[in-house]
A protein has these predicted regions:
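Class I S-adenosyl-L-methionine-dependent methyltransferase catalytic core
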Residues: 1-164
Length: 164
């Protein structure tokens, strides 16, 4: 596992403030790992976050964090944790999102196909934003939905929007 660094996460969310108001947004966190982005989205006021992670231990960790939050706040979290294959989830998902974050393993051979898949399945609402974390060896600047690229050390983010 290679979690998004705190430095990179803080910086990308500062950039995102110019794109989206997270208050009451519906978000999707793909390849959610330990749930760091999921919890960040929750803390920023998202009304619902669907978190998709295949790894059993990571999924269990997210569940435990949510259970602790529920005990502290006295209400059920707005997070829906799903343990499953991200590609299978995306292909069958009928919901649209204001915000999508994907942080696949950098060595994943299907990594370059993910932006196309997100838009083919129409998962992003009008004016929604998709943030894709990837290694430095990838360049998505020619993608029709690409809006900008940010790099923080070895962590790279490509931002995409729906074309209206």
């Amino acid at each position: 596992a290679r979690p998004t660094t705190d430095f990179a996460k803080e910086n990308i969310f500062n950039v995102l403030n110019g794109y989206i108001d997270f208050e009451d947004a519906v978000a999707l966190d793909l390849f959610s790992g330990t749930g760091s982005i999921t919890l960040e989205l929750l803390s920023r006021g998202c009304s619902q976050v669907i978190s998709v992670e295949l790894d059993r231990d990571h999924h269990r960790f997210i569940q435990e964090c949510l259970n602790k939050l529920t005990k502290v706040e006295g209400q059920r979290s707005a997070v829906i944790p799903i343990r499953g294959d991200v590609f299978r989830f995306v292909k069958s998902c009928k919901q649209q999102f204001d915000f999508i974050f994907a942080d696949p393993p950098y060595a994943l051979k299907e990594l370059p196909t993910i932006p196309d898949l997100i838009f083919e399945k129409n998962l992003l609402k009008e004016d929604g934003i998709f943030v894709f974390e990837h290694g430095k060896d990838y360049d998505f600047s020619q993608h029709p939905h690409f809006v900008e690229h940010r790099s923080y050390g070895s962590v790279n983010f490509s931002l995409f929007k729906s074309i209206v």
